[in-house]
């Protein structure tokens, strides 16, 4: 990654954070930073069979579960194949998963995901047969069926070589699931509703309670950094109350944190990161070892002479010049840090090491989280 590109990225990041620092944009709606109790997806799972594959399905010899499932399915259709020798590669055993949205009504549709279990090469062109989807309680909440879309492309030549783009062993069926049973959650009958902060914080929790109490006195209580409990005022049901408070705006707070992805060389940090007085020096040391073997031959007409390879090594050590010492005063901001490191020509991967060293020295007033 070139330094000019790094400087451009840093400039855009600083510009974005400068805009975000405006008070009007710092506030968020309550419904964007909390999750309401009971308003969540429920995960469903089922076992099924995909048919219609063009020779890319399970080999029944290596996938006995597929053979057993196929025989059982055909017997339910009145076809007896127990005494026959099934030898098809057009079917595949799959797991079907889906998320049941909150407040879903019977008859509504949802997307489902299909993934192979056996040694099938691709689900491209296959059709999932009707499959029951169950929840963690073992009850059936939906059924799924339909054509599987993998989003992958495969091409092969006569020599046997092939190229595949995407993952052909997993796919989706858009609106392939039909909800048969509702979860039974009734928010309207609740007396107290708990809201869970997506990013737990004492200050944010208190601010949410204060904003709600400013509109509906005595109706909200911050129980901890994660939970804010609310109770609708007299004469108002829970649905109407939630509708009234979810659009109230709050300025969320969060502890200073630096997120580092060492594999990709990505660094993300907020504008509230502060650094105590510290001096930083960074330089690059390059060690180069080159092997230039030479051939040694005996003189003409000599006896007992042999041609041998003589190793010749060239070792050089080069230290990059021109680096200066960067000094940051106490309370230095993110802008000062990035500007100073950019002036030193520091790459993102070097910055990761520098930030970790600053944290180890006790000068970085933020938490470092390595992904």
UniProtKB/Swiss-Prot annotation:
Q: Name one GO molecular function term.
A: structural molecule activity
Organism field: Caulobacter sp. (strain K31)
**GO BP:** bacterial-type flagellum-dependent cell motility
Q: Where in the cell is it found?
A: Periplasm; Bacterial flagellum basal body
The entry's function note states: Assembles around the rod to form the L-ring and probably protects the motor/basal body from shearing forces during rotation.
| One Pfam family, short name | FlgI
PANTHER family according to UniProt: FLAGELLAR P-RING PERIPLASMIC PROTEIN FLGI, FLAGELLAR P-RING PROTEIN
Instruction: Cite the entry's keywords alphabetically.
Output: Bacterial flagellum, Periplasm, Signal
* Signal peptide feature range: 1-21
InterPro entries xrefs = Flag_FlgI
- GO CC annotation: what is one? outer membrane-bounded periplasmic space
Please give the family membership noted in the entry: Belongs to the FlgI family.
Q: How does it assemble?
A: The basal body constitutes a major portion of the flagellar organelle and consists of four rings (L,P,S, and M) mounted on a central rod.
Top-level taxon: Bacteria
Protein name according to UniProt: Flagellar P-ring protein
């Amino acid at each position: 990654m070139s330094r000019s590109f790094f400087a451009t990225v840093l400039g855009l990041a600083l510009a974005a954070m400068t805009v975000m620092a405006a008070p009007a944009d710092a506030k968020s709606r309550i419904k964007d930073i909390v999750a309401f109790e009971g308003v969540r997806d429920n995960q469903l799972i089922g076992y099924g069979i995909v048919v219609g594959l063009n020779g890319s399905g399970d080999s029944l010899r290596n996938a006995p579960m597929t053979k057993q499932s196929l025989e059982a399915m055909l017997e339910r259709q009145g076809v007896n194949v127990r005494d026959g020798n099934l030898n098809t590669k057009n079917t595949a055993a799959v797991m079907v998963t889906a998320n049941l949205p909150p407040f879903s009504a019977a008859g509504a549709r949802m997307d489902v995901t299909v993934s192979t279990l056996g040694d099938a090469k691709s689900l491209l062109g296959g059709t999932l047969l009707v499959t029951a989807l169950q929840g963690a309680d073992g009850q059936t909440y939906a059924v799924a069926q339909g054509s599987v879309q993998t989003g992958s492309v495969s091409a092969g030549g006569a020599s046997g070589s092939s190229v595949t783009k995407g993952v052909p062993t997993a796919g989706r069926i858009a609106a392939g699931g039909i909800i048969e049973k509702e979860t039974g959650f009734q928010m309207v009958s609740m007396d107290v509703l708990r809201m869970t902060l997506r990013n737990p914080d004492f200050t944010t929790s208190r601010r949410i309670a204060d904003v709600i109490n400013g509109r509906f006195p005595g109706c909200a209580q911050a129980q901890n950094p994660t939970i804010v409990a609310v109770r609708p005022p007299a004469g108002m049901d829970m649905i109407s109350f939630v509708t009234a408070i979810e659009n109230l705006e709050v300025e969320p707070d969060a502890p200073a944190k630096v997120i580092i992805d060492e594999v990709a060389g990505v660094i993300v940090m907020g504008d509230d990161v502060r650094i105590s007085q510290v001096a930083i020096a960074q330089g690059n040391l390059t060690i180069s070892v080159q092997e230039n073997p030479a051939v040694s031959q005996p003189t003409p007409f000599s006896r007992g002479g042999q041609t041998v390879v003589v190793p010749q090594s060239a070792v050089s050590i080069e230290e990059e010049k021109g680096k200066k010492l960067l000094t940051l005063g106490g309370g230095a901001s993110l802008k000062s840090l990035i500007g100073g490191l950019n002036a030193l020509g520091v790459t993102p991967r070097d910055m990761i090491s520098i930030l970790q060293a600053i944290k180890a020295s006790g000068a970085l007033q933020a938490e470092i989280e390595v992904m």
